[in-house]
């Protein structure tokens, strides 16, 4: 069986202007063999959904350091659902309080990574998500 290249969209939603972490992760995932689409700063939920659709990505990764994750994630999920991307898994990186993790997972977030997360672990988790999605 030939393994295909996993396509991931890395997006910075909302007004958060800190993009260093997103760029580091994007570069690390590219080095790990992923095809990475980086959308840049200040993306709206609709922009993220449109990019995910146009780029035919396997996973959407959000970098959220603003603390607005509980507002942004449902808006992005809604935009993705409207674009018929309900089956595209979403992961989040950023400063996410432990109390919010179960709520985000209930919204369909398939991975949450905080500061200091190992890029190898993130890549392995993404591979697992894509493989399990393909099998279901």
For each feature predicted by the language model, list its residue ranges.
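Basic/polar N-terminal segments that are highly enriched at the extreme N-terminus
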Residues: 1-2, 134-136
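Short, flexible coil/linker segments at domain boundaries that flank nucleotide/cofactor-interacting
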Residues: 1-5, 85
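N-terminal pre-triad scaffold of radical SAM enzymes
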Residues: 11-15
